[in-house]
């Protein structure tokens, strides 16, 4: 199929479905009409989209962990523990790395080896291999909505199986689940594959089944300037809306300066709604998700809790609908269920104490919002120009030209010419602009902020600052000051 930002016809969609469902034997279990009937029977409190609408209307921030293991019964036990002991509001199923690369044979081996070893030898739940029946077994064993969280450039079969399995949210997008996760997948291919995932959700919406879609906000999780991640989120929201998605959660990964983070999340919500309405998508319900610190963590558990609670405070004061929870084992590896629950409990306590509180508008917040919105608009306007009005084509060209450029992305289709660094207050700014199409005024603003840091630290603005910033939080502070 040729890539364009146009809703797929029923014929195009169903023709591709036939191929997709043959990628692995469990694809045969998917029957769309039967899936619609099953999904309609799921109570509202277990529907992701509906629970998000409720949270947004009440003005509360809900907590969701990450979690997934190889064996079905152990996965259920883990999720129940995070529900009952941790007090999670939403549940995940983090999908394993083989599934993310569509290597289902190796998943099968991983399941068998895990059974032999008596513990999970995969870093997530192999949803495709367990199929619709397995996914339903998970849903029916818990009392909360389920979402697939993964990192899959081609998530078509996974999307078919999890939605038919009753999971009412799928995370990802053609940019956010390609550029930070894969090396050799073209932007065009991943955009097409995610159009399929969005069209599937659009099909369910047409049948009266509400399903949430969540672009992955943090991208590489390392010093991503808010305007760049917001431009990606807004782009993926617009592409999803064209395929018929009606419930979208745009995401943002904590950078660490409270004013900048609150400004970024509010700009993301406001500009997503502005762009959706400007392009005629008037019936899309937008919520936000704030990801607790995605970079390196301190190894000390008490310090890790400090990072978790600081992030939660920012999420609450920003008015996020949902916060993604980290654990005190983040620096060590995959957490125990106890450590995961501990992260949720710390998060929930902070959320409860801050319920209803918001950061009021200030001169600083207003300035930061104006900068982020202006930067984001520069990127998006250029994308529409490159695509001659077609955002899907514009996205491909934006990566070809470096207009959209994700710092530290492994993809060979990412320019990697833009370089971020913190300013003297810890806000993430642009050190090297690459081909990001900012006005001279915006460029000067970034340069001035970095000069303030250089003066304070008594050193030149340089790549050494970037390196220092990357390791700073793991060493116990936000900004990588010289030793």
Curated annotation (Swiss-Prot):
Domain of life, source organism: Bacteria
Catalytic activity as recorded in UniProt: (2S,3S)-3-methyl-L-aspartate = L-glutamate
Alphabetically ordered keywords of this record: Cobalamin, Cobalt, Isomerase
Gene3D superfamilies reported in the protein's UniProt record: 3.90.970.10, Methylmalonyl-CoA mutase (3.20.20.240)
EC id: 5.4.99.1
Activity regulation (record text): Competitively inhibited by (2S,4S)-4-fluoroglutamate, 2-methyleneglutarate, (2R,3RS)-3-fluoroglutamate and (S)-3-methylitaconate.
Similarity comment: family membership: Belongs to the methylaspartate mutase GlmE subunit family.
SS bond list: none
InterPro entries listed in its UniProt record: Cbl-dep_enz_cat, Glu_mut_E, Glu_mut_E_C_dom_sf
Cofactors demanded by this protein: adenosylcob(III)alamin
Gene behind the chain: glmE
Binding annotation for L-glutamate: 66, 100, 149-150, 171, 177, 181
Reported function: Catalyzes the carbon skeleton rearrangement of L-glutamate to L-threo-3-methylaspartate ((2S,3S)-3-methylaspartate).
Gene Ontology annotations of biological process type: anaerobic glutamate catabolic process; glutamate catabolic process via L-citramalate
An annotated Gene Ontology molecular function: methylaspartate mutase activity
Record text on subunit structure and interactions: Heterotetramer composed of 2 epsilon subunits (GlmE) and 2 sigma subunits (GlmS). GlmE exists as a homodimer and GlmS as a monomer.
Pathway: Amino-acid degradation; L-glutamate degradation via mesaconate pathway; acetate and pyruvate from L-glutamate: step 1/4
Name the UniProt record assigns to this protein: Glutamate mutase epsilon subunit
Binding, adenosylcob(III)alamin: 68, 123, 180, 297, 326, 330, 334
């Amino acid at each position: 199929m040729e890539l364009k930002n146009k809703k797929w016809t029923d014929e195009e969609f169903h023709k591709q479905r036939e191929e997709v469902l043959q990628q692995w034997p469990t694809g045969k279990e998917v029957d769309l009409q039967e899936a619609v009937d099953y999904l309609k029977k799921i109570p509202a409190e277990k529907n992701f989209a509906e629970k998000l609408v409720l949270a947004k209307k009440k003005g509360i921030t809900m907590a969701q962990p990450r979690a997934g293991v190889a064996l079905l019964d152990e996965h259920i036990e883990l999720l129940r523990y995070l529900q009952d002991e941790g007090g999670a509001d939403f549940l995940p199923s983090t999908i394993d790395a083989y599934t993310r690369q569509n290597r289902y044979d190796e998943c099968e081996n991983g399941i068998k080896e895990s059974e032999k070893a008596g513990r999970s030898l995969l870093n997530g739940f192999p949803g495709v291999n367990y199929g619709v029946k397995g996914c339903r077994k998970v849903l029916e064993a818990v009392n909360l909505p389920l979402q697939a969280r993964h990192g899959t450039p081609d998530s078509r079969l996974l999307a078919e199986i999890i939605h038919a399995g009753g999971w009412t949210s799928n995370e990802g997008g053609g940019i956010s689940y390609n550029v930070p996760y894969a090396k050799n997948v073209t932007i065009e291919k991943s955009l097409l594959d995610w159009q399929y995932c969005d069209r599937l959700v659009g099909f369910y919406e047409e049948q009266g089944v509400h399903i949430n879609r969540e672009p992955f906000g943090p991208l590489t999780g390392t010093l991503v300037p808010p305007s760049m991640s917001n431009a990606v989120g807004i782009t993926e929201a617009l592409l999803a809306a064209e395929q018929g998605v009606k419930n979208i959660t745009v995401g943002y990964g904590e950078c660490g300066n409270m004013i900048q983070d609150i400004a970024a999340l509010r700009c993301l919500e406001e500009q997503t709604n502005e762009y959706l309405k400007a392009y005629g998508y008037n019936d899309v319900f937008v919520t936000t998700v704030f990801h607790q610190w995605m970079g390196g963590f301190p190894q000390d558990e008490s310090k890790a809790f400090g990072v978790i609670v600081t992030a939660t405070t920012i999420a609450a004061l920003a008015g996020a609908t949902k916060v993604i929870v980290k654990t005190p084992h983040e620096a060590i590896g995959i957490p125990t269920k106890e450590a995961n629950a501990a992260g949720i409990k710390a998060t929930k306590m902070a959320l409860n104490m801050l319920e209803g509180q918001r950061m009021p508008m200030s001169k600083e917040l207003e300035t930061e919002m104006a900068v982020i919105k202006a930067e984001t608009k520069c990127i998006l306007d250029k994308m529409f120009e490159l695509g001659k009005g077609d955002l899907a084509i514009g996205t491909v060209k934006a990566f070809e030209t470096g207009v959209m450029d994700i710092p530290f992305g492994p993809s060979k289709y990412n320019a990697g010419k833009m370089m971020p660094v913190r300013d003297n207050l810890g806000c993430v700014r642009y050190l090297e602009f690459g081909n990001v199409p900012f006005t001279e005024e915006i460029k000067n603003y970034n340069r001035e902020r970095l000069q303030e840091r250089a003066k304070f630290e008594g050193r030149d603005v340089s790549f050494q600052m970037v390196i220092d910033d990357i390791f700073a939080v793991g060493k116990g502070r936000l900004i990588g000051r010289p030793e």
